[in-house]
Curated annotation (Swiss-Prot):
Family: Belongs to the frog skin active peptide (FSAP) family. Ranatuerin subfamily.
GO cellular component: extracellular region
Signal peptide location: 1-22
Tissue and organ distribution: Expressed by the skin glands.
Cystine residue pairs: 66-71
Domain of life: Eukaryota
Protein purpose: May have antimicrobial activity against the Gram-negative bacterium E.coli.
Protein name: Ranatuerin-2PLa
Length: 71
């Protein structure tokens, strides 16, 4: 009877530790998720700005080319 209680106590203890570690990892993953979305937003904004600048530069070069070649 004593060995059964001892093994049950050990089983409960190990299960509690395992559950605690899983919760800590889940919390860390959730924190990283927020940071990733902020980084993705920053990347999205920078990509948009880069594309707008690229299009404006292309249009300005086309107008300049037209003025030079008198189209």
């Amino acid at each position: 009877m004593f060995t059964t209680k001892k093994s049950m106590l050990l089983f409960f203890f190990l299960g509690t530790i395992s559950l605690s570690l899983c919760e800590q990892e889940r919390g860390a993953d959730e924190d990283d998720g927020v940071e990733m979305t902020e980084e993705e937003v920053k990347r999205g904004i920078m990509d948009t700005v880069k594309n707008v600048a690229k299009n404006l530069a292309g249009q300005l070069l086309d107008k300049l080319k037209c003025k030079i070649t008198a189209c």
